[in-house]
Amino acid sequence: MEPGNYATLDGAKDIEGLLGAGGGRNLVAHSPLTSHPAAPTLMPAVNYAPLDLPGSAEPPKQCHPCPGVPQGTSPAPVPYGYFGGGYYSCRVSRSSLKPCAQAATLAAYPAETPTAGEEYPSRPTEFAFYPGYPGTYQPMASYLDVSVVQTLGAPGEPRHDSLLPVDSYQSWALAGGWNSQMCCQGEQNPPGPFWKAAFADSSGQHPPDACAFRRGRKKRIPYSKGQLRELEREYAANKFITKDKRRKISAATSLSERQITIWFQNRRVKEKKVLAKVKNSATP
């Protein structure tokens, strides 16, 4: 068909054959209805050989010619986008891949090798955590191998002394009963130097009294002469004090009613002992 003529019936049949076969997608470039018989040449026509990758197992597929294109003529150049936007997968073997350039750069630097303990024969053992350990660590103070008194021995030398001086255990003797003496400073072992240094202030403010701790009893406070005179006067008048008299004496002597009651009980017991002693001495 010449360029200036219109499309004939044979040309329409050729178009229907192309649409039914599905040989191409972009038929605008090959349609005889357009003003140009062929697409403009974008690049020189080059025949490419099929690519055979080393890792590919399937044979390359051959492209079948379109039924509407005459075979005798030279093939026209295919424009961009003729086969659509699809992609073709390929397989590549691992041997064809190139190694990373960074690995070659890092390979130029030698790797550090672990150093054995025999390479440091001149290193002193006191700078290590344990004796004979060829490490670079400083000795760490712990309660297991370091004494409390740091002046005993060289620094870093392991010691196995106890943390604090502990006195030996002694059970309390209750031979005299519950009213007997429970704790006395003179009978205990003297405390260690650490306890003396730590509690020097507290012991200075509250000096310990000998045998001051008793079970259920307070420290005895002696009565003054004025209080004893008032109590003896009332005892001479009446050996058994009444409630009103007890209140008056409590207000006059600044003593509690319980203290006055106990004093009268003790005074009666004392009088009985004195009378019994006089009676025993009078009998032949």
Curated annotation (Swiss-Prot):
Changing L144P: In HPC9; uncertain significance. The lineage of its organism: Eukaryota, Metazoa, Chordata, Craniata, Vertebrata. Residues 216-275 bind DNA. It comes from the Eukaryota. The keyword Nucleus applies. Changing Y88D: In HPC9; uncertain significance. Heterodimer with MEIS1. Heterodimer with MEIS2. It is linked to Prostate cancer, hereditary, 9: A condition associated with familial predisposition to cancer of the prostate. Most prostate cancers are adenocarcinomas that develop in the acini of the prostatic ducts. Other rare histopathologic types of prostate cancer that occur in approximately 5% of patients include small cell carcinoma, mucinous carcinoma, prostatic ductal carcinoma, transitional cell carcinoma, squamous cell carcinoma, basal cell carcinoma, adenoid cystic carcinoma (basaloid), signet-ring cell carcinoma and neuroendocrine carcinoma. It is found in: Nucleus. Keywords: Developmental protein, Disease variant, DNA-binding, Homeobox, Nucleus, Transcription, Transcription regulation. PROSITE patterns: HOMEOBOX_1, HOMEOBOX_2. The gene is HOXB13. SUPFAM superfamilies: Homeodomain-like. One of its GO terms (molecular function) is sequence-specific double-stranded DNA binding. This is Homeobox protein Hox-B13. Residues 217-246, 270-273 are annotated as: Interaction with DNA. Sequence-specific transcription factor which is part of a developmental regulatory system that provides cells with specific positional identities on the anterior-posterior axis. Binds preferentially to methylated DNA. GO terms for cellular component: chromatin; nucleoplasm; transcription regulator complex. Residues 258-269 are annotated as: Interaction with 5-mCpG DNA. Belongs to the Abd-B homeobox family. Its main location: nucleus. It comes from Homo sapiens. GO terms for biological process: angiogenesis; epidermis development; epithelial cell maturation involved in prostate gland development; negative regulation of transcription by RNA polymerase II; prostate epithelial cord arborization involved in prostate glandular acinus morphogenesis; regulation of growth; regulation of transcription by RNA polymerase II; response to testosterone.
